[in-house]
A protein has these predicted regions:
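Bacterial N-terminal signal peptides
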Residues: 1-10
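Noncatalytic scaffold domains of N-terminal-nucleophile
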Residues: 14-34, 38, 42-203, 208-210, ...
Length: 253
């Protein structure tokens, strides 16, 4: 409730509100759903709300929905057309695998070029109504001010706690001073993520796939024998999906 009231105050100071009666927002986390609802309340359309919810979900459910992953979206436009966006992770151009060499299954060498940001921005650019900074306000607010972490996220962290201990950044944010997982109800503040989201909200794809954020991503990956380069990030592009459809029991699927 506090999150909703605070964000509503921020919006009310800057944007003329509109009332939308025919909309539903569903997500795995109440804050992500609330973000979509708030975007509807200030005149956004379904794409604005979906993008706002997805970016907020990256903050509150990072183990499942972080901005370092991939995205596939399918949607129906107001005229009934079915389309989608393909923003899958891609293999870095410099990746090589010697004959007989086993595939890496863990660590920096397994990191592909992330597509979530490009995919969400394509959805917004092609179909959104509000400006990107407005759409991303809820996600930035939650990352910067924190939220009470839910049991489901804690359970996933506990299941992989040995991996969280392998990296300074995951230890910093998701483990306590004793290298143990946070507990349900603990407050999680992610200032670094908030800064990245701000760069994206102001500069679009260039705020993530180029510039300071991209340089830090590549520096970390290259220092740990990964493959992603600045060129890989800059050249990444989300594309329109080829939609496969068919008939089933009298319905088009």
């Amino acid at each position: 409730l506090f999150f909703a009231l605070t964000i509503s105050v921020i919006f009310s100071c800057n944007i003329e509100k509109s009332i939308y009666n025919n909309n539903v927002v569903s997500s795995p986390h109440p804050y992500a759903s609330e973000a979509g609802k708030l975007i509807f309340s200030v005149g956004g359309n379904a794409f604005d709300a979906a993008v706002a919810s997805a970016f907020t979900l990256a903050v509150v459910e990072p183990s499942m929905s972080g901005i370092g992953g991939r995205l596939q979206a399918i949607y129906m436009t107001s005229d009934g057309d079915i389309s989608g966006v393909d923003a899958m992770t891609q293999i870095p151009e410099s990746y090589t695998k010697s004959e007989g060499e086993e595939n890496d299954s863990y660590g920096y060498k397994t990191i592909g070029i992330p597509g979530v940001v490009a995919g969400l921005l394509k959805l917004h650019e092609d179909h959104g109504k509000l400006d990107l900074e407005t759409v991303m306000k809820p996600a930035i607010y939650v990352a910067e001010n924190g939220f009470e972490i839910l049991p489901g996220e804690i359970k996933r962290i506990k299941g992989e706690v040995e991996y969280f201990n392998d990296f300074e950044s995951t230890k910093k944010y998701f483990l306590n001073s004793n290298s143990e997982p946070l507990k349900p109800g603990d407050k999680l503040i992610q200032k670094d993520l908030a800064n990245v989201l701000k760069q994206i909200s102001k500069n679009g794809n260039a705020g993530f796939y180029e510039g300071e954020v991209a340089q830090k991503i590549v520096q970390d990956i290259q220092a740990n024998r990964g493959y992603i380069t600045l060129s890989d990030l800059k050249n990444y592009e989300a594309i329109e999906s080829d939609i496969i459809s068919g008939d089933f029991n009298g319905y088009k699927v």
